[in-house]
Structure formats: C-alpha cells, structure tokens
Amino acid sequence: MTETFKVAITFVSPSSEALAQSIIDSINKSADTTRAIKIQADMRDTDSPLRIIDATICAFGPNIDILVNNAGVESLVSLSELGLQDFNECIDVNFRAVVFMTKSVIPYLRSPGRIINISSSSAHAGGLSSGIYAASKAAVEALARFWATSLGPQGHSVNTVVPGLTQTDMYERIIAEESSAAYHRTVASMTPMGGRVGTPEDIARIVSLLVEPRSQWVTGQTISATGGLILL
C-alpha cells in the first residue's frame, strides 16, 4: 500500500538542518507541490510545540493526521555527578515536550489520528548512568498507554516504538568516546538479528506500519524495534 503524506520535519542545529533539508528535497522533488517543510525547534523551549503546530497548519491546512514524538536527548552522567541542569534538560526534552506537543496537536488531529511516541531500549535495561534518560523514556511509554485509553473514543491510536542502538547523530557522538564505543560494540554483537545496531530506516518501517489504516486496531502497545535485543 502506498500512502502520500504532507510532512513537517523539525530540526535543532545547523548539522541536523542539512539532514532535514536533504529529506525534504527528496520528498518534494517527486511531487508537483510542496509536500514537506522543515521547522527549527528546540524542544527545551516551552513555546516550541505551538510554533510547530502553527507552521504546520500554515503550510498544509488545519487537519493533522499523524504525530511522531521523536525528539530526544541522552544523559550519560552518573547519579553522583547528576546536576539539576542535566536532570531538567533530559526531562524537558524527553518527557515534558512529548506531553505538550501532544496536547497542542489534539485540537487539529483528524480521526482516525495516529500518535507514535519514540522510547528507548534503555527504559528496559540497566546501565551505569544516573538512569534519568531511561526513566524519561519509560514515562513516555506510560503516557502512550493512558492516552490510548483517553483518546480511543475519538478514534485515535497511541503506540510506542522502542528502538535499540540506532545509527543516529546522537549515537555517533556517544561512540566517539572509546569506552562508549566498546560498550556499544558489545551490545551490537548481542543483537540476535544480524549482530548490528539498527538504522533509522529500521525504525521508520515500524512507524510506517503503525500509521497504516490496517493497524487501526493496534493501540496502547509498546513495540520493540531492537532486532531481538529487548523482548517485550
């Protein structure tokens, strides 16, 4: 099944802007009209959700069908080194932004709407950091279960996708440190399917499946996209 969507892609930094622009160019070159736009938004800013919605409806009209809550920032500091700034940044981006982005989209979400939260395998595994990142992602999974119940009567589904290690900009920054690189190589080797880390395309395919009409009966679910590393 081939679906055609109009897409608003957000980015934060100049480095991510280049990637966002390349995706937009790829989408728009195959269409007669503009089908993709980019929006600069730092989800630490409390006004970002409304700015994203405003820019989206200005470009494409007042109906929104899908929201993917994908913004994230990782905290690798230990509990003994955890500061209030580290805590707030992680919670603000990974949790608070999901709450208020979803709140902002609801008035424009056309039934049957789809909301996809992106969690992390860290929410289901131990580690050596403070655990704030894992906790913030576990909270996102809890939100999806509650919203699936409260938004279901309006025809909306809410699900969570749980990626494992995935080759993103954040991943590349983390493995730049040799100690982190060794750990990630070990985890990758433990992945049953292929012994590798995931790719953005691996995760996108799962999200794509969840937004299809044939997935309308799936809601409130937490779906592992880890190549079998995390079994839920």
From Swiss-Prot:
Matching SUPFAM superfamilies: NAD(P)-binding Rossmann-fold domains
Binding locations of NADP(+): 19, 42, 70, 103, 133, 137, 168
The keyword Calcium is annotated on this UniProt entry: no
Record key words, sorted: Glycoprotein, NADP, Oxidoreductase, Signal
Catalytic activity field: a primary alcohol + NAD(+) = an aldehyde + NADH + H(+); a secondary alcohol + NAD(+) = a ketone + NADH + H(+)
EC id: 1.1.1.1
Phenotype on disruption: Significantly reduces the production of T-toxin and decreases the virulence to maize.
Pathway stated in the Swiss-Prot or TrEMBL entry: Mycotoxin biosynthesis
Signal peptide, first to last residue: 1-20
Keyword Chloroplast: no
GO molecular function, one term: alcohol dehydrogenase (NAD+) activity
Residue positions the entry lists as glycosylated: 28, 117
Top-level taxon: Eukaryota
Positions annotated as active site in the UniProt record: 119, 121, 133, 137
Family per similarity comment: Belongs to the short-chain dehydrogenases/reductases (SDR) family.
Role description: Dehydrogenase; part of the Tox1A locus, one of the 2 loci that mediate the biosynthesis of T-toxin, a family of linear polyketides 37 to 45 carbons in length, of which the major component is 41 carbons, and which leads to high virulence to maize. One of the PKSs (PKS1 or PKS2) could synthesize a precursor, used subsequently by the other PKS as starter unit, to add additional carbons.
Protein name per UniProt: Dehydrogenase OXI1
Organism field: Cochliobolus heterostrophus (strain C4 / ATCC 48331 / race T)
Organism ancestry: Eukaryota, Fungi, Dikarya, Ascomycota, Pezizomycotina
